Amino acid sequence: GAVVAVLGLFDKGKTFVLNHLTDAALPSGKKVSTKGLSFKHVVVEGTRFIILDSEGSYAPVKVESELSVVEKEMSEHFIQDVIFELADYFLCVVNDFTSLDQRYLDKLTRNLQNSNKPFREVIVVHNCKEVIDEETLHYVWESQVTAIYGSGTMQSTKVAAQDPLSLEL
């Protein structure tokens, strides 16, 4: 099956989104963070995938020596290189879309455009986990996508906090 990489900055909800897209049960939340790379085999609607869940980029670094930050950056670059070589498709998870997210996404997009990969687009997933109603969702979409990129269109929305019985948010 295809290899799908789930990328993004630290603490954006990559594993949370992955769990909801695939019905997986990987540990996620504020008390848990993915270390390095996590591989998961899933079947979604009859299609097999290998999911690469990555440690978020730009995570805080415990300073133990003068080289702590440099070593962390080198580790992140190595992991990104491995992911780039292995993955067929790339999901980039953002929540509040910041200029750092934009720079990260721009770098990934440029690398893909300059590669020989057959699918050279990044699928951006807006993890609006703090959004509690549809009005706020439309505001966030307008201010963080349409106002910035002009023609952004909402393709699909899944609110993870929706109660399945009452359908209330």
Please place each PLM-identified region on the residue numbering.
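Conserved GTPase G-domain substructure that encodes guanine base recognition and part of the catalytic core
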Residues: G1-L169
